[in-house]
Structure formats: C-alpha cells, structure tokens
Amino acid sequence: ALHRTTDMFGPIPYSQVGKGSFKVAYDSQESVYRSFLKELEEAVQTLDDYSNKSKEVLPAFDIVYNGDVNKWMRFANSLMLRLAIRVRFADAGLAKEYAEKAVKHPAGLIDSKELAAQMGKGAGLQMKNPLKVINEEYNDTRMGATIYSYLAGYNDARAAVYFVKNNGFKAVRCGIAKSGDAYNGFTRPNVHEDDPLYWMKASEVCFLKAEGALAGFDMGGSAGDFYNAGIR
C-alpha cells in the first residue's frame, strides 16, 4: 500500500514512523523506494532461510497462501520487480539491479494463474470482497462519467465486465455530492461478494518483464514474448 501512497503523494513519513514521536519527518520518494527494495531483498532472504525447514508457516492464519513460504517468496520477488520497473526512468541503475535480482532469484516469480497473490480463499476462510461491501453496504460507489466517456468513446466491450449493465449505463459526474437514494439510479461496479481481491497476477509480472527487457535489462527473454504471454 505504501508504494501506491508515495506514487500518489511523493514524499511520505516512513523511516521514522513507529518510533514514539508524534511529529515525524517526511522521507523523499527516492529514499522510500530504496528502503522498499532493500527491505524486500531482506524479506526474501529471511523466507529463503526458513523455507529450507518448513513449507508451511501458520497456515490457519494466512488468507493468501495458506502458510506456503515458497509462494510468499515468489510474491516478494514479483513485488520487487514491480518497484524496480517503476523507478527505471528516475534511476536506471537501481532499476536494473533489483529487476534482475528479482527475475534471477531461484525462488522464482508469480508465473501462473494458480500462484496469483489474492485474498479471500486462504486458511479455509471466505472473506467478503471489500469493493462489494463498499458498493452495497456503503452505497456510494458508482460508475464515474470519466471512465464512461473512455469506454463509450472507444466502444469498449469491457464496460459490461467492469459494470452492471441494466438498461444501459448511467454515470455520475465526478465530484458531485448526492445523498440518500440519489445514487441508486447510477450504474454499479460489477463485483461479487466471493470475488477474490488480487494483489498481483502472473499477467502483470509478464508485462513487467517485457518492460524490463525493452529497457535492456536481462529478463531471460524478449519483450515481445513476455508481452504476448501476459495477454494470454
């Protein structure tokens, strides 16, 4: 979540958080990303040390991978690859270093549908998809006019996948505040209670490797092959 936070806001409190101070300095985005990558590298090493002893850690409490340490290592490497690719225009050397570390680590990456990082099916539990909760229980999530303009303008077939089509689509202009039942007439997101909440899929990893290969990093294949694999 924090890499999305810094991508949106830039500098954020990070290195000094949780150390007992009510006033915390902001870290630069560069230092935050360097910390992210270093911490992921350390996490992979810690998991690697443990994975030689046991393949399951607290499976009853792991709603993502049922305690499978090897799968967590794949996710950590995949997340490292994501962050490395994000900084390639700001620091190509740092991006290349960590992208290649992620790809070449023997634990591997998320490279199949079955390995996707997702919440909702682990540990014998079934969570409610939070987007469904926000949509139905909070009753304030509807199709925005901006995305409708894109989808309708390009006659994009995905509109009926992203949203519930009842007698067409009706979008609300972003920034308009309505109350009570006023939202009910607008189109709802097409999400179900038992839909998994994905953190990362194999398709994203393929596209990340394609971008890395395009930048000249050693990703173990060509940009075109990885790109086509992501589409498939």
Language-model regions: role of each:
Residues A1-R232:
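Structured, solvent-exposed acidic/aromatic patches
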